[in-house]
């Protein structure tokens, strides 16, 4: 079943058009869709990361949860859905805290970042078949090492540092 996204201009004004996802082509210039990224931290201060399915773009790379907001969905609802789909964690919308936004002109993405501080452990995680193949609970320092070694998506790590900054990454 095709995936559709609502289109926006750079100022997040709706263009009242939908776009069918196609990994082989870029978004039209000056048009954007919303992508959500969720940094999930448990009571022990560990960050949940997942490993992408080998058949997906950037396969076998580690990242935090996230994905595109579907047509008709709010960014917050998209974040709740993506977190559940990729990890099995059921967060209520009020449990996700909006942390910031990064606009990527080249890819036509407006990235919204959320923080989820939840009571979860390894037994709470259920991976999404076809999307994720592994997970780990790690420290920010471990993520930095994984980024340096090419195991963690470097652009995702750089965006995390830009948005979450001193909150979690000041000791790296």
Residue locations for each model-derived region?
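Acidic, metal-coordinating catalytic segment for phosphate/diphosphate chemistry
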Residues: 1-37, 43
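Nudix hydrolase/Nudix homology domain
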Residues: 14, 59-61, 71, 98-100, ...
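A glycine-rich, hydrophobic loop/mini-helix early in the fold
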Residues: 33-66
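The catalytic Nudix box helix
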Residues: 48-49, 64-97
């Amino acid at each position: 079943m095709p995936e559709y996204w609502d289109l926006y201009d750079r100022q997040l004004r709706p263009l009242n058009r939908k776009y069918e996802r196609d990994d082989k082509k870029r978004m039209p210039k000056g048009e954007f869709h919303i992508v959500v990224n969720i940094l999930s931290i448990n009571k022990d201060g560990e960050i949940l990361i997942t490993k992408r399915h080998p058949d997906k773009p950037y396969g076998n790379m580690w990242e935090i949860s996230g994905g595109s907001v579907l047509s008709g969905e709010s960014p917050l609802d998209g974040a709740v859905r993506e977190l559940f789909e990729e990890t099995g964690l059921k967060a209520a919308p009020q449990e996700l805290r909006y942390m910031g936004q990064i606009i990527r002109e080249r890819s036509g993405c407006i990235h919204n970042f959320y923080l989820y501080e939840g009571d979860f452990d390894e037994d709470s995680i259920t991976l999404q078949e076809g999307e994720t193949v592994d997970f780990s609970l790690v420290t920010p320092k471990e993520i930095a090492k994984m980024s340096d070694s090419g195991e963690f998506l470097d652009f995702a790590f750089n965006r995390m540092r830009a948005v979450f900054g001193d909150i979690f990454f000041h000791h790296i």
